[in-house]
Amino acid sequence: YIHPLQMHFADAVRATLPAHLTHCYFVTSGSEANELALRLARAHSGRRGMIVQDHAYHGHTTGTIDISPYKFNGPGGDGAPDWVEISELADPYRGRFGYDDAKAGEKYAADVERAIGALAERGHGLAGFIAESFPSVGGQIEPPAGYLSSVYERVREAGGLCIADEVQTGLGRLGDAYWGFETQQASRT
């Protein structure tokens, strides 16, 4: 049911987005938003495989638990479905490549190529990659410069969609940018 205020709000949201992002679809929760993004990636690509970051949390519905290592690798979890591949969390504080490594973003992004290959070996084409632009459940991590833009380039080359889960970190919460992906110059690569 459409109300004029919804249209006004959609216009206000669109005004904060890069010009090529022109549509809004309102849902009632972050879980529902990510479930919809998962369905759209599959419909667009005709494939099922998803790449997720280690420690990620994307919601509490069945579909979003399937793409949330925080849940499926936690107590009571059943592990990753065979159509999900976990990529290394780009964590310059605790990870393999630190703040002192100018190429850390590119090095972490290279793991996505491994993940694409692992999905293919199991017979799954890539539908998409989902990540919080600033992983919150993973530790409130600011990824190294160039990480997301490099990942997005690889994912798009493989025919997948790039999903920025901005539920906890978007909408102006980061200060310098309205959306977390903007801090990584990752909206269109």
Question: What annotation goes with each model-predicted range?
Answer:
Residues 1-189:
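Conserved N-terminal phosphate-binding loop of PLP-dependent enzymes in the Aspartate aminotransferase
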